[in-house]
C-alpha cells in the first residue's frame, strides 16, 4: 500500500515536472538562440545593439508574468492545479509557433519585431501562471518529510528545459553553418517546443489533484484565489518578494546572461560557450534534489543563508576573474562556483513559498509576488548588463547583482524556518496528499 502510494506520488510529480520542462524549454530557446536571430528581427547594425533590442523584448515577456500569475493563480485556486497547468502549456505552445513562423525584418519590416513582442507576451502570460501553480502542485503532492526533495524538481526541470535548449543548439551548430543558423536554423527549436507541448497536454490531463485543493473545492470557498484573501497575509507576501529578489537576479545572471558574457566580453567561441553552459547546467540539475533533500534534514533557512552570504561576497570576484581569463576550463569552474552558490536558493524556493500560504490562495500567493519581483529584477538583469556594457561600465553590473543578493539576505536572516511553520503540514494533519480527481 505504501509502495503504491509512493509510486503514485512519483508519477504525479513526473507529470507535473515534465510539463514544466517544456514550458521552460520554450522560454529559454529565445535566449539561447538570440545570438542567431537578433539580426532577423531588427535593422542591420552593431551586434550589441541588436542583442540589446532582443534582450528588451525578453524583458517585455517578463512584464506579462505578473498578469499570468494573477489570472492562472486565481484559476488554479478556484478550478484546480491540473486545469491551470494544462491551460498554461497550451498558451506557451502558441507563442512558440508564432515566433517560428514570423518572417524577418527584411520581409515585413517593423511588423517583425511587433509580432515577436506579441509572441513573447503570450509566453510571459503562460510562464507567469506556470511557476506559482507548478510550485504549488509539486509541494502539495509531495510526501510529508520529503517536500524539499520533491519540490526541488521544479528547478530540475526548469534548468533541464534550458539544457535541452542548449542541447538542440549544440546539435544544430554541428549540422548547420552559421549563415544557415541565422537564416532559418534558429526556427527549428521553436517548432520542437510547440510539438512537445502536445504530449504534455495528454500527461497533464491524467494528473491527480491534491487533497488540499479537493477539500477547498468541496467547501466552495468564495474567497479562493482572490486578491482580498491574499492581502490578509501581508507578511507572507513581503517574504516572497524579499526571498525572490536576489535569487532571481542571480539565477538569470548565471544561467542566461553569462552565455552572452562569455561570448561578448570574455571572447570565447559560441560553440565552446554552449558546451560550457551545457555541462555546468547538467551538474546544476543534479545538485537541486541533493540540496532539496538536505533541506528536509536541516531546514530551508540554512541553505538560503548560505546563498545570501556567499552570493554577496563572491559574485563580483567571479566576474572580474572571468573577464580576464582566456581558458574555457577556468570559465567553466567560475560558472560552477556561481551555480553552486545559487543552488541554496533555487533548490528550495518553491517549497518555502508554498509553505507560507493556505491552500485557498496558495497558487496566487506563490505566483503573484514572485512574478512581480521577477518582472522588475530578474527580467531586466540581462538588459541592465548589456546597457552598462554598451556605455563602458559593465563592471557595475557585478555589484548590482551582489547588492540584490544582500537585500534578500536580510529577509533570510529575519524569516522563520518555514518547514516548522508550514501551512501545508498544518492543513493536512497527516492525511494523504492526493486524490483521484479525474472526474472533476
Task: Kindly label every feature range from the protein language model.
Residues 55-74, 93-95, 278-291:
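Central cavity-lining transmembrane alpha-helices of secondary-active solute carriers
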Residues 34-65:
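Extracellular/periplasmic helix-loop-helix junction of adjacent transmembrane segments
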Residues 78-90, 297-308:
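Cytoplasmic membrane-interface "Motif A"-like loop-to-helix N-cap segments
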Residues 149-173, 369-381:
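Glycine-rich segments within core transmembrane alpha-helices of 12-TM secondary carriers
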Residues 31, 234-283, 377-382:
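Extracytoplasmic gate region of multi-pass secondary transporters
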Amino acid at each position: 500500500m505504501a509502495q503504491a502510494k509512493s509510486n503514485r506520488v512519483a508519477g504525479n510529480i513526473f507529470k507535473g515536472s515534465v510539463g514544466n520542462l517544456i514550458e521552460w524549454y520554450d522560454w529559454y530557446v529565445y535566449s539561447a538562440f538570440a545570438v542567431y536571430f537578433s539580426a532577423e528581427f531588427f535593422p542591420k547594425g552593431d551586434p550589441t545593439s541588436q542583442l540589446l533590442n532582443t534582450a528588451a523584448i525578453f524583458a517585455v515577456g517578463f512584464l506579462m508574468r505578473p498578469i499570468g500569475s494573477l489570472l492562472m493563480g486565481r484559476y488554479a485556486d478556484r478550478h484546480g492545479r491540473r486545469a491551470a497547468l494544462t491551460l498554461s502549456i497550451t498558451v506557451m505552445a502558441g507563442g512558440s509557433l508564432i515566433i517560428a513562423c514570423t518572417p524577418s525584418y527584411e520581409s515585413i519590416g517593423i511588423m517583425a519585431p511587433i509580432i515577436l513582442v506579441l509572441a513573447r507576451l503570450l509566453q510571459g502570460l503562460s510562464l507567469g501562471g506556470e511557476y506559482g501553480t507548478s510550485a504549488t502542485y509539486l509541494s502539495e503532492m509531495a510526501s510529508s518529510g520529503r517536500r524539499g526533495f520533491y519540490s526541488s524538481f521544479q528547478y530540475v526541470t526548469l534548468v533541464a528545459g534550458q539544457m535541452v535548449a542548449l542541447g538542440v543548439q549544440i546539435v544544430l551548430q554541428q549540422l548547420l553553418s552559421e549563415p544557415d543558423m541565422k537564416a532559418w536554423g534558429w526556427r527549428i527549436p521553436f517548432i520542437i517546443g510547440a510539438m512537445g507541448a502536445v504530449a504534455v497536454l495528454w500527461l497533464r490531463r491524467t494528473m491527480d489533484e491534491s487533497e488540499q485543493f479537493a477539500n477547498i473545492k468541496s467547501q466552495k470557498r468564495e474567497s479562493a484565489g482572490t486578491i482580498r484573501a491574499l492581502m490578509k497575509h501581508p507578511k507572507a507576501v513581503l517574504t516572497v518578494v524579499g526571498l525572490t529578489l536576489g535569487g532571481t537576479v542571480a539565477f538569470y545572471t548565471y544561467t542566461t546572461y553569462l552565455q552572452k558574457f562569455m561570448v561578448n566580453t570574455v571572447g570565447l567561441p559560441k560553440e565552446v560557450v554552449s558546451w560550457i553552459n551545457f555541462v555546468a547546467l547538467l551538474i546544476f540539475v543534479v545538485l537541486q534534489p541533493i540540496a532539496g533533500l538536505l533541506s528536509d534534514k536541516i531546514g530551508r533557512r540554512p541553505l538560503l543563508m548560505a546563498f545570501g552570504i556567499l552570493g554577496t561576497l563572491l559574485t563580483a570576484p567571479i566576474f572580474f576573474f572571468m573577464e580576464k581569463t582566456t581558458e574555457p576550463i577556468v570559465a567553466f569552474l567560475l560558472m560552477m562556483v556561481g551555480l553552486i552558490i545559487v543552488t541554496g536558493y533555487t533548490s528550495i524556493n518553491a517549497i518555502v513559498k508554498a509553505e507560507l500560504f493556505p491552500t485557498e490562495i496558495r497558487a496566487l500567493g506563490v505566483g503573484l509576488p514572485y512574478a512581480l519581483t521577477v518582472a522588475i529584477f530578474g527580467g531586466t538583469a540581462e538588459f541592465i548588463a548589456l546597457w552598462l556594457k554598451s556605455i563602458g561600465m559593465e563592471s557595475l553590473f557585478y555589484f548590482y547583482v551582489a547588492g540584490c543578493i544582500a537585500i534578500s539576505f536580510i529577509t533570510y536572516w529575519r524569516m522563520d524556518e518555514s518547514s516548522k511553520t508550514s501551512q501545508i503540514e498544518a492543513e493536512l494533519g497527516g492525511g494523504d496528499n492526493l486524490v483521484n480527481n479525474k472526474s472533476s
